[in-house]
Amino acid sequence: MIDDRKLQILRAIIQDYISTGEPVGSRTIAKKYNLGVSSATIRNEMADLEDMGFLEQPHTSAGRIPSSRGYRLYVDRMIEFERLSSEEEGLIRNSIIDGTLYEVDKIIKQTSALLSELTKMTCIVKAPSVHKSFVKSIQLLKVDDVSILCVLVTDNGVIRNTVIKVKSVPISEELIKISKIITERLKNLTIEQINLEVISNLNRALNGYEDIVNAVLPALYESLKGDETSEVFLEGTINIFNYPEYNNIHKAKEILELLHDKKSISELISDSDDMTVKIGDEIFVPEAKECSIISAGYHVGDRSLGTIALIGPRRINYSKVLSIMTEVMKELNETLKNK
C-alpha cells in the first residue's frame, strides 16, 4: 500500500521529470513543490518508492526518474486532464473535415495529421483490411467504347477504382441498370463472400451482360490485392526526434526501424474501442520498452472500424496528450457517425 505522502512526492517527481527531462533529487522537490516536509524526509520516501518499483536511478545521476510502474500509477490515480486552450479547441473543431463530403480514409488521414501536430508525437493509424469490409455500392461508368470505370465503395468509406475492358460498352441507361443490379446482389457481402454461387446468380440476373460481370469481379479482386491485412500508416515520424531520449543514434535507429515495420506496429496497438495507455514494460515488443502508446478506436456509424494511436517516449505530458486525444476522437467519431 502506498500512502498519501508517497503519492504526493511521486506526483511531484513525475511532473518535474516530464517538464525538465532531468533526474529529480530530494532537494529539488523540497524547494519547488512545498510539500511541507524536509529534504531528508523526501529522500527517505524516495528510497522507499524506489524499493517499491515506482522510481529508478539512472547510472550517471544521483537523482531519480519514474519507472514504467510509476508512470502507470500516475496515469491511473493521479492525473488531471489539462484544459485545452480555445485555440486548440477551435483547431480540433475546424480541422476534421465534413464527413458527408469526404471519404473516410481522407478524414482519418486529416485527423492523424492534426493529432501529430497538436501532440508533437508520431501518430499511427491501423485501419481494417478491405477484404473484411462490406460492399456498399458498385458503379460502372463509360470511359470509351470498350472500357468501363468500375468504382467500388465499401461500408467503411474505402473507394477503389479500376478500368475493365469489354467487347462493347452498353449505353449509359443500361450501365446504370447493371450497376444497380450488381450493387443489390453484392451489397453487405465482403469481398471474400463473393463466391461462385453469388457470381452464378448475378450472371442469371444480368443475362446478356455476362462479359461485364466476368470482367468486373476479377478486376475488383486485382485492385484489392495486397489489402488482406490491416493497413497501417504513420504521420509525423520525424516528431520522435523532438525528444532527447532519441538523441542517441542507436535508440533513434531502433525506434525508426520499429516504426517502419508495419507488422510489429500493428501488434503494438490495442484493438480496444476505449482509450488505452500502454507504458514501457507493458509493451511486449523489445524495441518499444522505453515507449508509451496511447490508442483509441474510431467508428463509422455503429461499426468499430480502426484504431488511432500516438507513440513517444515514456516521458510525455500525459495530462495534455490525453486531453487532446479525448477531444479529437470525440470530434472524429461525431463526424463519422452518419457515414
UniProtKB/Swiss-Prot annotation:
- Taxonomy, superkingdom: Bacteria
Listed GO molecular functions?
Answer: DNA binding
User: What's the family?
Assistant: Belongs to the HrcA family.
Q: Lineage of this protein's species?
A: Bacteria, Bacillati, Bacillota, Clostridia, Eubacteriales
Q: What name has this protein been given in UniProt?
A: Heat-inducible transcription repressor HrcA
Q: Which residues form a coiled coil?
A: none
> By its UniProt entry, which PANTHER family does this protein fall under?
HEAT-INDUCIBLE TRANSCRIPTION REPRESSOR HRCA (PTHR34824:SF1)
BP term (GO), one: negative regulation of DNA-templated transcription
Q: Does the record carry Transcription regulation as a key word?
A: yes
**Matching InterPro entries, A to Z?**
GAF-like_dom_sf, HrcA, HrcA_C, WH-like_DNA-bd_sf, WH_DNA-bd_sf, WHTH_transcript_rep_HrcA_IDD
